Amino acid sequence: GEHTRSGDAMLLINPHTTFYFRPEIHVVSDEGLNAYGAVTWGQFFVYQGFNERTGWMHTSTYVDFLDEFIEDVSTRDGRRVYRYGNELRDVTTQTVTLRYRTTTGMAEREFETYRTHHGPITHAIDGKWVATRINWKPAEALAQSFVRTKQRDHAGFRAMMQRRTNSSNNTVYADADGTIAYYHGNFIPRRDPQFDYSKPVDGSDPRTDWQGIHEVDETVNVVNPTIGWLQNCNSTPFTSAGPDSPKREDYPVYMAPDPENFRGVHAQRVLEGVSDLTLEGLIALAYDDKLPGFETLLGGLVSAWDDTGRDDAPYAQAIDLLRNWDHRTRANSVEMTLAHHYGMQFKKHGTYPGTLRGMALIEFLGTGSVTQERVATFERTVDELTRDFGRWDIPWGDVNRFQRLTGDLALRYDDEAPSLPVGLASGDWGALASFRARRGNGSKRIYGVSGNSFVAVVEFGDRVRAKSLLAGGQSGDPDSPHFDDQAQRYVDGAFKDVPFYRDEVEARAVSRYRPGLSD
């Protein structure tokens, strides 16, 4: 809270997910449950959210929590066995019956399944069976997810984390006591570091076996860093708290192989030197429109163009726009249209090592690619924009749109149907407020499909205070008034106040329902 006007801790909750996948929920019981936030379909616990005293946000992790073991399988006396050290162990066989529906009624089919002590046989590599091992404690994982929502302080939250069944997430935490914390992963098997577990390992060698699960204290985490802030954007934990971040050399590679990305770079920039922060100020940081991914990418393009000595229209005019651009995305920005389509064109058709992803790929396209290819790709970008829209200098909001036509899972888009201009951009370029858009159903425009979905900012004072936003609306029914009633708010970044306490909820109630009763 040292950087906030109130002195209280604040939390930004912004999972970048598929639109309409995380409805906004408030669950309350007389047994002490009072949690608000986002849930994935079917979950009865608040996945990313807050209660009166604690808040939690998950990002996706690259922690290696799954391994593949190549098994040495043979047949002895009519039995399938596999080698483990000097032993031959039986392969476990189980018959699974699956019932399914056909046009004439129900049918069933039997499958033989196989497993070793490592786990089920899932596939083969070069003719050798491979067993896959993961965290398979679904009941315990479900319990941890629910217990998380009822914690009152960091001691309880850390005890919950010690259950160690959360495989796929990192966790950012804040509470009413002023504690902030970051946990990189949770379920992390202990392994022999001499082996490379990013690839399948030899299952016949006992040394490759898991050696238990790391304690929470052994994992990468940060609690109350001196700098006073924490961030993670599906990125490396080694920049999560500026100079107070954990050190890479203190941990095994499998514990944090996550690369840096442009959103992580952007988050660090906006947090450095922050002070006197309010909830509204936190929203402003979260919607900062700078896109660091274009700094190197477009710098390399402009340099390559200058090397040609050319000044022919319309390409020279387009290059000059990018040369003088501040790399900020806005709905009226022609530069953003050019930059996005150039980057996407280069990623789709460019020549680069196939192993490159994310930030490393963008940096290569900016500085490591063939200069003639940069120029040719940009020319093709300008030509295609002219073909599709009748001009190349088209504002970003005319191309980048928000549209919700149906409640179908498979979203469809229509250039002739109503839609809203959006000034946000993809997280690929470093946008903290991400809006990933693509074409669909033969459209020329691009339409948002994922990114900012449920977003909330929370301040943990004497009374918790929060603001939130949801892509489109809460309902999946096009006939509901809540199908797209938040669409304009979403586009504008105009957050609504969250009614958390009972008096706030009752003051805004439109209707009430109890089973068998309504008013």
What are the residue ranges of the model-derived segments?
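Mature extracytoplasmic enzyme cores
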Residues: 1-315, 321-324, 328-331, 445-519
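Generic signal for short, ordered secondary-structure residues
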Residues: 136, 140, 210, 246, ...
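Short amphipathic alpha-helical patches
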Residues: 181-188, 290, 294-295, 306-310, ...
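A terminal-accessory region detector
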Residues: 195-197, 311-411
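C-terminal accessory/interaction regions of large nucleic acid-associated machines
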Residues: 385-495
